[in-house]
Curated annotation (Swiss-Prot):
Transmembrane portions of the chain: 301-318
Biased composition regions of type Pro residues, renumbered to the chain: 262-294
Keyword Magnesium: no
Region (Disordered): 261-294
Subcellular location: Host membrane
Source taxonomy: Viruses, Varidnaviria, Bamfordvirae, Nucleocytoviricota, Megaviricetes
Presence of keyword Iron: no
Membrane topology type: Single-pass membrane protein
Keyword line: Host membrane, Membrane, Transmembrane, Transmembrane helix
Cellular component terms (Gene Ontology): host cell membrane; membrane
Protein's recorded name: Uncharacterized protein 002L
Length: 320
């Protein structure tokens, strides 16, 4: 439960009672005078035509009439209590559960009863809703929620530490909210990389913190710098050159004209290495020279020839 209080003057005096006995037969001149306690003392009243002690006439708080608000979107009564304020009657201190004040009709009624209430606006406007794109945003940034216009007026008119605390609390609880990129910029690694290289105002170069972007911003972040340096873009270009960031990283988050960026020429292609020369196969050893064959004497042939000659000689001898 988130408690919020406001004070209002009660004008209704209809719910009255006597602080002590004040009717014939029930009082006397010796009846002690009563008191209204914390209730509204409307003054003295004569009792029993003056025969009894006069008594204060008191009025009770008209809780619903003084403090009543419309019910929440879920049909719950936001009123927690109604008590006489520390200043005394007829000032009434109305206490509400701010979590149950969740419609614009309730807010409008609250403002008509109590006037502007930054504390209510902080709780009401710093609630997550969806925009027409289906993204989670605060009511300040919503283009679909009926309270968008009212919350933007509060956002513009009530800069200060209390509002900053409400913005910061919303973005801590909703780190993925589309309108928290500026407040949550420290969680963006691209922001961290670029920020470490310079001290220029974030509104000058980080797109979510630019003055014309629909992002939640604290205090002086909403002021438009008059002397934004141009060197920051060269820093980013250098980071693109050395590969610290990519174009996809920075094109939507860094406020530079990237059409002026000229990427460095690609490095020359390395000369392919000369393939190694295949090794020369070893020369096979020279086979040994075969020995010269010697003539083989065929003894059988020689004996045959010799035999044939001998036979021929014998035949010729016989003829003779």
């Amino acid at each position: 439960m988130s408690i919020i209080g406001a004070t209002r003057l009660q004008n209704d005096k209809s719910d009255t009672y006597s602080a002590g006995p004040c009717y014939a037969g029930g009082c006397s001149a010796f009846t002690p005078r009563g008191t209204c306690g914390k209730d509204w003392d409307l003054g003295e009243q004569t009792c029993a035509s003056g025969f009894c002690t006069s008594q204060p006439l008191c009025a009770r708080i008209k809780k619903t009439q003084v403090c009543g608000l419309r019910y929440s979107s879920k049909g719950k009564d936001p009123l927690v209590s109604a008590e006489w304020d520390s200043r005394g009657a007829p000032y009434v201190r109305c206490t509400y559960d701010a979590d149950l004040i969740d419609t614009q009709a309730q807010v409008d009624q609250f403002v008509s009863m109590f006037g502007e209430s930054p504390s209510l606006a902080e709780r009401y406007c710093m609630r997550g809703v969806k925009n027409t794109a289906g993204e989670l945003v605060s009511r300040v940034s919503s283009d679909a929620d009926p309270a968008g216009g009212w919350c933007r007026k509060w956002y513009s008119a009530h800069r200060g530490p209390d509002q900053d605390a409400a913005l910061g609390s919303f973005c801590i609880k909703n780190p993925g909210a589309a309108d928290c990129k500026c407040i949550n910029r420290a969680s963006d690694p691209v922001y961290q990389k670029v920020k470490t290289l310079h001290a220029y105002p974030d509104q000058c170069w980080y797109v979510p913190c630019a003055a014309d972007v629909g992002e939640l911003k604290m205090g002086t972040q909403r002021d438009t710098p008059t002397n934004c340096p141009t060197q920051v873009c060269q820093i980013v270009f250098n980071m693109l050159d050395d590969g610290s960031v990519t174009m996809d990283d920075v094109k939507n988050t860094i406020n530079c004209d990237f059409s002026k960026y000229v990427p460095p020429p690609p490095p020359p292609k390395p000369t392919p290495p000369t393939p190694p020369t295949p090794p020369t196969p070893p020369t096979p050893p020279t086979p040994p020279t075969p020995p010269t064959p010697r003539p083989v004497h065929n003894r059988k042939v020689m004996f045959f020839v010799a035999g044939a000659v001998l036979v021929a000689i014998l035949i010729s001898t016989v003829r003779w």
